[in-house]
């Protein structure tokens, strides 16, 4: 029987001989006039005479070109996932409407057959990586992220750790055959701890050429349920090899929606024609100023003693600034030095008598222990001033959560990881971040937590300990890489 069968990311046509339908073949091939030959063919024919066509190619065109074939659509059979990817929590919410609508696009139409392939095209810096990681978190799918070089793989590795609650052991890099051998030797329980797989195209391509069953066997072994292709305008051949050999959905990411060469661009657009697409121009994004944050840099000194500095340098020797060790030091040894300038600022900026109202504010800290101590001290010192204080963190009991209504509170104290959960806080006018970080991506996402409010100034306060050279260097990096690019004003106190 002659059949056309639709799968999530490819279409299979049975009983096909090469050259029997030149229209389909030419539509998916790049012809080089200089060498008088095809340099790329976006289809495959296996030894059993099955033609494989990209899932994004126009299905109406396929049916019209094979009218004597019966049609079967098996895409819905692959909707369910083999194993849920539990326990991934985002530290941050989408920072703007572009990220919000990008995530809506990735989540929408989950029962729509065309939703198995989605194309997200955002400019560099608009948050493709963040959106992809967020999608994995809420969809609970086990991803394999494909990149074309080690530098990109390292960037993904860092961003996953920046954006989520995961540790290094929860992310696995597939680079070289030895990394695959190591995976296969792991027990099922060991692999269960891996939440993200990042694969180098060259490694997958090399092993696939040695064994045509490699890709499908790898995906089945790891329970992969979503493919994410970064820089999807590159490495076409391997992208198609992966799509032709797997039956889970694909997300294609790129800042470049097309190819510069006209012949290549024609084929590129044919391959992804039916895949739903979203870019910053796809839907109407509400007009708002690109710069609306007023950044205030508030410096203080914790004055560490030589004994602590020696211990801190030792703890920070291997992985850089040890933020947990530093935060414990602030909580247990230098809380007064940390707290008094902060309290003074809060009384002046959050509750200024001249304003006649309280400025809704969020304070970000790194650890729950520091949060609890700060909450207790502020509750005592601000008692009787008609300021409602609430806290939010992962260790709160059910009764504590009920008692702390952050929507109604004037002053909210939370951790960076807890900040990423829940809905946006309406009317938030100020964020005070006490978290040392050198990551411009993390800083940008935290900055984005403060939304534009029409006819109102909003403030982002960078509360920084200048007793540490590393903290000063981090601040300099944040100023140059983030604040100068995104802030309306920058003021140092």
Label each residue range with its predicted role.
Residues 112-135:
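Walker A/P-loop
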Residues 130-131, 138-163, 366-371:
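Conserved Walker A/P-loop ATP-binding site and its immediately adjacent core
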Residues 152-178, 381-384:
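Conserved helix-turn-beta segment of the N-terminal RecA-like "Helicase ATP-binding" lobe
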Residues 181-187, 373, 386-417:
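Conserved helicase ATPase core of P-loop NTP-dependent helicases/translocases
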Residues 226, 231-292:
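Post-DEXD/H (motif II) to motif III coupling segment of the RecA-like Helicase ATP-binding lobe
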Residues 277-361:
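Conserved interdomain linker/interface between the two RecA-like ATPase lobes of SF2 helicase motors
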Residues 423-436, 458-462:
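A short beta-strand element within the Helicase C-terminal
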Residues 438-457:
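Conserved SF2 helicase motif VI
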């Amino acid at each position: 029987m002659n059949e056309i069968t639709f799968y999530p990311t490819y279409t299979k046509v049975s009983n096909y001989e090469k050259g029997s339908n030149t229209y389909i073949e030419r539509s998916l091939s790049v012809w080089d006039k200089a060498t008088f030959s095809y340099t790329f063919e976006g289809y495959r024919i296996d030894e059993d005479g099955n033609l494989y066509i990209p899932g994004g190619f126009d299905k109406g065109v396929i049916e019209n070109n094979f009218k004597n074939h019966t049609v079967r659509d098996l895409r819905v059979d692959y909707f369910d996932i083999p194993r849920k990817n539990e326990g991934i929590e985002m530290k941050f919410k989408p920072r703007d409407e572009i990220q919000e609508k990008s995530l809506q696009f990735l989540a929408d139409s989950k029962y729509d057959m065309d939703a198995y392939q989605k194309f997200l095209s955002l400019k560099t810096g608009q948050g493709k990586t963040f959106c992809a990681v967020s999608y994995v978190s809420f969809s609970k799918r086990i991803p394999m992220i494909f990149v074309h070089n080690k530098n990109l793989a390292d960037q993904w590795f860092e961003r996953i750790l920046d954006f989520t609650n995961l540790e290094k052991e929860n992310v696995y890099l597939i680079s070289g055959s030895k990394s695959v051998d190591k995976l296969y030797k792991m027990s099922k329980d060991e692999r269960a701890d891996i939440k993200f797989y990042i694969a180098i195209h060259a490694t997958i391509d090399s092993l696939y050429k040695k064994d045509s069953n490699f890709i499908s066997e790898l995906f089945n072994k790891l329970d992969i349920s979503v493919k994410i292709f970064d820089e999807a305008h590159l490495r076409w051949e391997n992208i198609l090899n992966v799509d032709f050999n797997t039956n889970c959905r694909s997300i294609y990411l790129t800042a470049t929606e097309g190819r510069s060469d006209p012949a290549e661009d024609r084929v590129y657009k044919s391959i992804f024609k039916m895949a739903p697409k979203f870019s910053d121009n796809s839907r109407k994004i509400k007009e708002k100023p690109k710069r609306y944050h007023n950044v205030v840099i508030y410096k203080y000194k914790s004055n560490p003693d030589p004994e602590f500095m020696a211990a801190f340098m030792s703890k920070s020797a291997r992985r850089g600034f040890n933020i947990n060790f530093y935060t414990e030091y602030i909580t247990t040894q230098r809380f007064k030095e940390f707290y008094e300038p902060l309290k003074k600022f809060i009384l002046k900026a959050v509750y200024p008598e001249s304003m006649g109202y309280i400025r809704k504010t969020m304070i970000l800290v790194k650890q729950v222990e520091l949060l609890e101590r700060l909450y207790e001290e502020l509750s005592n010192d601000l008692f009787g001033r008609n300021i409602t204080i609430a806290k939010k963190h992962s260790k709160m009991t059910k009764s504590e959560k009920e008692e702390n209504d952050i929507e109604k509170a004037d002053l909210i104290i939370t951790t960076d990881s807890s900040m990423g959960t829940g809905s946006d806080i309406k009317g938030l006018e100020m964020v005070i971040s006490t978290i040392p970080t050198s990551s411009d991506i993390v800083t940008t996402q935290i900055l984005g937590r403060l939304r534009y409010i029409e006819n109102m100034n909003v403030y982002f306060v960078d509360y920084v300990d200048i007793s540490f050279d590393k903290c000063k260097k981090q601040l300099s990096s944040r100023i140059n890489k983030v604040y100068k690019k995104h802030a309306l004003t920058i003021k140092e106190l």
